[in-house]
C-alpha cells in the first residue's frame, strides 16, 4: 500500500505537541504514531514530511522536520472545519529517485481520495 512508505512521527515530538493547549492547531490534527495511522477517509488535508536532501547543496543525513512541525502546530486555527492528519515522513530511499517514487505514490493516493497534500521539505 502507498502509505507503507510513511514513517510515524517521533515520540518526543508527539509529547511536545501534546503539551500545547487545546487552542492550538495541534488539537485539531490526527497524528501517525507508532501504534495508530489516521483514517484517511475522514481527512481533508494531509501533511507529509520528506526526509530527502540528496542533490541539494548539503547532503547531511541529519534532516529533522520537528522544528517546522512544532511551529506549525503552535499556531492558532481559524474558524474552519477541515480535518487534518499528519501522516509522518517519507524516509530516504536507496536512491533519490526511489524517494520521489514514494512521494509520487503517496501524493497520488491522497489526491484520489480528494485529500489535499501539504508537503514539508527542507532543501539544504
Which residues fall in each region the model found?
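Metal-dependent C-N hydrolase catalytic cores
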Residues: 2-124
